[in-house]
Amino acid sequence: MTHPPKTPLLDQVTYPADLRKLEDRDLPQLAREVRDEMIDAVSRTGGHLGAGLGVVELTIAIHSVFDTPNDRLIFDVGHQCYPHKILTGRRDRIRTLRQENGLSGFTRRAESEYDPFGAAHSSTSISAGLGMAIAADLEKTDRRVIAVIGDGAMSAGMAYEALNNAGALDARLIVILNDNDMSIAPPTGAMSAYLARLASGRTYMGFRDFGKKLTAYLGKNIDRAITRAVEHARGYVTGGTMFEEMGFYHIGPIDGHSFDHLLPVLRNVRDNARGPVLIHVVTQKGKGYPPAEAAADKYHGVNKFDVITGAQARVKPNAPSYTSVFAEALVQEAALDDKIVGITAAMPNGTGLDKLAEAFPSRCFDVGIAEQHAVTFAAGLAAEGYKPFAALYSTFLQRAYDQVVHDVAIQGLPVRFPIDRAGFVGADGPTHAGSFDTAFLATLPGFVVMAAADEAELKHMVRTAAAYDAGPISFRYPRGEGVGVDMPARGEILQIGKGRIVKEGTKVALLSFGTRLADCLLASEDLEAAGLSTTVADARFAKPLDHELLRQLARHHEMLITVEEGSVGGFGSQVMQYLSSEGLLDNGLKIRSLVMPDIWMEQAKPEAMNAHAGLDRAGIVSTVFRALRRGVAVGVAG
């Protein structure tokens, strides 16, 4: 284990007010120390490293120039917020990042007054910033609002909706576009720095405001002609006419790692801007840490690693991951059916669709951070006879719910939805938990909703979805590795709406939806040891339900427990609705539904989260004993 870095200048900075006492010439050294501190911290916790390394100078410059927290600073997504946390009173806890009871990996309002708006999903910062800017105007305060958004997040339509609205309102909003895709090289040299200072200066911006007032008296046609002439002329020097057309004053691109560029521009904008301003800053993801700079993903998300070598800790898996099983099964099916296509929203590696892209590049589409578009794009393909697999994380599918309802479900289009990261996801906390997909999909008429109990079942569900053309179909599976079951050479086509009994008993029935099946089987061992004969069943389907299986379990057992890693309103609620409507609760059946608790569960390891929720072996056994008014047997495994 390496020792924490020496940081004499950073040791003087606890809050931004301390930072503002430093001279400009001290800031490059401070940036080096912040990088060293962040690298050491993330090497111990894992997390999102590359994005934060790329915005160290920008973060320091913003806090140096603006009066945070009175001035509002909003980070989009939040992957880049680690330097911000170090500089805003949280350095003493930075080595608890993404750990149980530790700092969040994202900005959170409840964590600090320096986090005025929480983030984790993309493209929200400009909308939130605009709301805050308008609030400041209504209150007649001189509060500035700064939204920092990456070029990736700018691929989502919500960002442009907000830009368009901000321009129309002529709001006092500062948007900083952090361009770390390296598609545009940052300008270098004294002339580019001079032009950026000139464009952001009082004279130029004041002349622009004067021009706006003058042309207001000359009629709309002359106004438009003059405005276009000025902005197009300026565009030859600085670019950015698209943002100008939306009503933003555009500055840049400027070097996001040069304080000589950043500080004068930010100060000019602070002192002179009256309407919306967009500052285009070019940065390098992974800046200042050679292993990150050399890596293809710039160390976007990393495990714990060795600071000297950059080598990440790797735990040898006991079984293949669910994501890899899905990807291999989809490639296998795609090789046999040229109508199968894959769609991902900027997550080809995370969803495994990079494997499909390697095998069939013309049949795999990365649409960017645009889940709404992804779903309707898939609907269009389905309408033309293709078999689209729109692979999305559960938490991101939420962003496209209207498209799922209006464009897919109502039209009965056979779009396939592989739903990754279902259930608890651990260190990313409540913003990324896959909690609600079963509940919001199972309410839709004609929608088939499946959950894989293990990796072999997942393979069956991939083939089942490929073969199903009667309407939309989904299948959910968690993050992480499978349970190590024997794998079929190819998946089987499952009968729609039919579950399976895995273990037969007579007194207690445990009905699992998804990967909680393994804990149900373990719990059954403890229940059997306590003299309670236990049936364990795998529902497979939340919609359509297996009515025959439900009737059998309800009529021949004293107690029925449904278990799912999802919210209330999901599988258990569907079961309860059916049993009550059929009168199967009238004869004294004891029934319990185990779901995620109705709270936003904080980050922890998934197994700890399941234990807290009562969804593990011990929680299931405890639920049975409480319902049957029996004490917990000595020796029951936890």
Curated annotation (Swiss-Prot):
GO molecular function: 1-deoxy-D-xylulose-5-phosphate synthase activity; magnesium ion binding; thiamine pyrophosphate binding
Binding note for cofactor: Binds 1 Mg(2+) ion per subunit.
Keywords tagged on the record: Isoprene biosynthesis, Magnesium, Metal-binding, Thiamine biosynthesis, Thiamine pyrophosphate, Transferase
Family matches, as PROSITE patterns: TRANSKETOLASE_1, TRANSKETOLASE_2
HAMAP family assigned: DXP_synth (MF_00315)
Family: Belongs to the transketolase family. DXPS subfamily.
A Pfam family matched in the record: DXP_synthase_N
InterPro entries noted in UniProt: Dxylulose-5-P_synthase, THDP-binding, Transketo_C/PFOR_II, Transketolase-like_Pyr-bd, Transketolase_BS, Transketolase_C, Transketolase_CS
Cofactor(s) needed: Mg(2+); thiamine diphosphate
Name of the protein described by the UniProt record: 1-deoxy-D-xylulose-5-phosphate synthase
Binding site for thiamine diphosphate: H79, A120, H121, S122, G152, A153, N180, Y289, E371
Pathway note: Metabolic intermediate biosynthesis; 1-deoxy-D-xylulose 5-phosphate biosynthesis; 1-deoxy-D-xylulose 5-phosphate from D-glyceraldehyde 3-phosphate and pyruvate: step 1/1
Quaternary data: Homodimer.
Organism from which the protein derives: Rhizobium etli (strain ATCC 51251 / DSM 11541 / JCM 21823 / NBRC 15573 / CFN 42)
Catalytic activity: D-glyceraldehyde 3-phosphate + pyruvate + H(+) = 1-deoxy-D-xylulose 5-phosphate + CO2
Protein EC: 2.2.1.7
Binding site for Mg(2+): D151, N180
GO biological process: 1-deoxy-D-xylulose 5-phosphate biosynthetic process; glyceraldehyde-3-phosphate metabolic process; terpenoid biosynthetic process; thiamine biosynthetic process
Purpose: Catalyzes the acyloin condensation reaction between C atoms 2 and 3 of pyruvate and glyceraldehyde 3-phosphate to yield 1-deoxy-D-xylulose-5-phosphate (DXP).
